[in-house]
Amino acid sequence: MMSKLGVLLTVCLLLFPLTALPLDGDQPADQLEDRMQDDISSEQYPSFVRRQKCCGEGSSCPKYFKNNFICGCC
């Protein structure tokens, strides 16, 4: 009985090695943070819209248009 369990354990470890498990650095959240540190433009990533900076003298900040955020302060 014990030898059968040993064989089963060995076969399972050979078919599914522990190195196949994802590491902390492979998590999608970490990859997003790395991508955000790069210079991202909306031309490269259409789903990413860069926040416009439209502060100036006499302008109110932040600005909204039809309840949509359009720009923030510097």
From Swiss-Prot:
What's the source species for this entry? Conus striatus
Task: Please tell me in which tissues this protein is expressed.
Answer: Expressed by the venom duct.
Q: What protein am I looking at?
A: Conotoxin SIIID
Q: Between which residues do disulfide bridges form?
A: 54-71, 55-73, 61-74
Entry annotated with the keyword Disulfide bond: yes
Where is it predominantly found?
A: secreted
Give the keywords, sorted: Acetylcholine receptor inhibiting toxin, Cleavage on pair of basic residues, Disulfide bond, Neurotoxin, Postsynaptic neurotoxin, Secreted, Signal, Toxin
Q: Where in the cell is it found?
A: Secreted
Q: Which residues form the signal peptide?
A: 1-20
Record note on modification: Three disulfide isomers have been synthesized and tested. SIIID with the disulfide pairing 1-4;2-5;3-6 is the most active.
